[in-house]
């Protein structure tokens, strides 16, 4: 009874049960089991534990699994110490009563059935295994079998929560407090509530709270609905690009492709159909008038001329008009392509990606947010495939700008760090790698290159400035021996500002004199650092309420003074590689895999047929009208 008294005292004092129960030896567990065999249902200890109805045989069977050290084995080799600690805590607080009720099992099965909304894919084996355990929990042969099923269901719950919310290791780390309670101990409460039937709210609690994840959820649902409707067919390839105003047999297929993904609306189709009918009606009226007159004059040539003016359906139907071109431009903008409305190779490739491929890419993006974890209340997010850098605060995008990242051969590294300071009007100390690859070839061709571009050359061995004309630029050690230092100014490679987060990669955010490159859709041009379209705006955003730093920066910029300004608070910065993001309009952006790291893009195998001229186009016109009306 000693363990009971300790537990009751601790419970009344508000101390976690886990701190007591997890510290008890197996022998103490055994003594506790023997003592509790005679405990009545009305035990005050049980009343303090949510008034749970006692099944002493089940509680004893669960406790036996603790004593026999089978508990961890039931969770499997993949279970973390944190998960095991939390599970032990949950059962200890219940005095080993089973977690899962009828409602809880139903809720777990419902959560398994709807887990796809979180971008999680469960196999048939997973679903079947959980279903069998749910049945065994209440219909197992004896108490031991039912107890084992209950613990296995708890293990499945932890696995499901990890799949939805990401790794749970941090949720199970012990704190250094007196109670030694597990961190994120609310998972014990969530497990308790799930066992009573509220699994859905537990899933919502552990799911990533990042705005991007939640917007990706909505887009996942939208693209799954598109897939359920049959997706789209690939547009046939051709030797020549299709430009606005041209006629092409692929135009009807392009129109259908735009409709399928929502870029070309029912209203657009209905308006275009109405336009054709209006043209036809006008010409028919004119033809009747001319025919009447020719009856009186018997001038059949005029009649033929009027009839010849009737709009040709086939030509009209395959004309790449302005409305469709606008839809293609919107598609290009949302896929990181040059926005010109031209159906060229890159646009055609993006159009022909299958809807299933896009669904998988959205899921992969959701997986990223699961693995990334909490990025902080205020952070800078620089994403390579989207060529953007953004400032986020309280789950809101507050600043966004175009960015330039490393060439595929000099890829920008993916990592997280903290911004500490900025430098106004910086000098640029060219890294040895850039000197060897870029500067030495220029110097070999023209030694005046350094002076023309504002570089001072320093001999690393002597520390002295040297004249370019006196150096053997063909020497094997030229790249490592000579340091290139570029003075501040309009041509400085770092622009007017650099933002520093000390790291092993020597990567930072900075400006650039080559601002014209920001107009390019694909912006992998740097040697690894991140060039910002508006570095000053980003630095001011990082400063936040640190008005002194903001004033110091602005003063240094105004005076063209080289100055380091330390921020009052460090701000996390995350350089990532995610090929699907969601813009403020709520629509997904599918970026090109610029570093070929995902290799997950799949093309649609079904190819749309080319349009064939119709002698009787009435059926096609009727179909257009019905499609338009049906999708309004």
Question: Which residues make up each language-model segment?
Answer:
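Hydrophobic alpha-helical segments and their boundary regions
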Residues: 6-8, 15, 99, 108, ...
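Cationic-aromatic interfacial patches
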Residues: 16, 30-180, 299, 305
């Amino acid at each position: 009874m000693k363990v009971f008294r300790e537990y009751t005292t601790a419970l009344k004092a508000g101390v976690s049960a886990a701190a007591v129960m997890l510290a008890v030896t197996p022998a103490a567990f055994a003594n506790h089991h023997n003592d509790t065999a005679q405990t009545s249902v009305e035990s005050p200890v049980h009343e303090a534990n949510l008034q749970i109805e006692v099944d002493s045989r089940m509680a004893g069977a669960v406790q036996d699994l603790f004593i026999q050290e089978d508990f961890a084995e039931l969770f499997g080799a993949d279970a973390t110490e944190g998960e095991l600690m939390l599970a032990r805590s949950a059962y200890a607080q219940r005095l080993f009563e089973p977690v899962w009720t009828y409602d809880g099992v139903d809720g777990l099965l419902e959560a398994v059935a709807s887990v796809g909304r979180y971008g999680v894919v469960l196999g048939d084996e997973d679903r079947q295994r959980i279903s069998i355990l749910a049945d065994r929990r209440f219909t197992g042969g004896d108490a031991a079998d039912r107890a084992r099923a209950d613990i296995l269901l708890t293990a499945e719950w932890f696995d499901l929560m990890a799949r939805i919310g990401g790794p749970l290791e941090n949720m199970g780390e012990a704190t250094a407090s007196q109670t030694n309670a597990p961190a994120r101990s609310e998972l014990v409460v969530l497990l308790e509530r799930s066992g009573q039937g509220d699994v859905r709210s537990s899933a919502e609690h552990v799911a990533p709270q990042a705005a991007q994840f939640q917007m990706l959820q909505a887009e996942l649902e939208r693209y799954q609905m598109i897939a359920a409707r049959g997706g789209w067919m690939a547009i046939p390839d051709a030797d020549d690009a299709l430009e606005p105003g041209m006629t092409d047999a692929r135009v009807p297929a392009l129109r259908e492709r735009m409709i399928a993904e929502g870029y070309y609306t029912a209203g657009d189709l209905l308006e275009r159909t109405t336009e054709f009918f209006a043209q036809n009606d006008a010409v028919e009226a004119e033809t009747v008038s001319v025919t009447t007159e020719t009856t009186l004059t018997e001038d059949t040539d005029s009649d033929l001329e009027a009839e010849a003016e009737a709009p040709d359906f086939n030509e009209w139907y395959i004309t790449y008009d302005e409305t469709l071109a606008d839809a293609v431009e919107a598609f290009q903008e949302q896929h990181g392509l040059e926005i010109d409305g031209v159906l060229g190779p890159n646009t055609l490739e993006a159009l022909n990606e299958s809807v299933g491929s896009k669904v998988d890419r959205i899921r992969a993006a959701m997986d990223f947010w699961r693995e990334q974890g909490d990025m902080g209340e205020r952070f800078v997010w620089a994403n390579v495939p989207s060529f953007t850098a953004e400032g986020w605060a309280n789950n809101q995008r507050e600043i966004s700008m175009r960015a330039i990242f490393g060439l595929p051969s000099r890829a920008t590294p993916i990592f997280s760090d903290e911004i500490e300071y900025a430098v106004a009007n910086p000098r640029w100390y060219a890294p040895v790698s850039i000197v060897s690859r870029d500067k030495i070839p220029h110097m070999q061709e023209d030694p005046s290159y350094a002076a023309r571009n504002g570089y001072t050359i320093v001999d690393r061995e002597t520390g002295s400035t040297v004249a370019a004309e006196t150096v053997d630029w063909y020497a094997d050690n030229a790249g490592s021996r000579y340091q290139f230092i570029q003075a501040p100014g309009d041509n400085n490679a770092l622009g007017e500002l650099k933002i520093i987060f000390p790291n092993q990669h020597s990567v930072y955010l900075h400006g650039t004199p080559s601002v014209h490159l920001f107009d390019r859709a694909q912006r992998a041009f740097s040697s690894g650092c991140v060039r910002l379209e508006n570095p000053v705006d980003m630095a001011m955003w990082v400063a936040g309420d640190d008005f002194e730093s903001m004033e110091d920066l602005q003063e240094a910029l105004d005076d063209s003074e080289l100055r380091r300004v330390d921020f009052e608070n460090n701000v996390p910065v995350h350089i990532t590689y995610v090929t699907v993001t969601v813009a403020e309009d709520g629509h997904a952006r599918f970026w090109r895999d610029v570093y070929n790291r995902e290799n997950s893009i799949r093309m649609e195998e079904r190819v749309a047929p080319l349009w064939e001229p119709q002698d009787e186009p009435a059926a096609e016109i009727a179909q257009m009208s019905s499609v338009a009306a049906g999708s309004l």
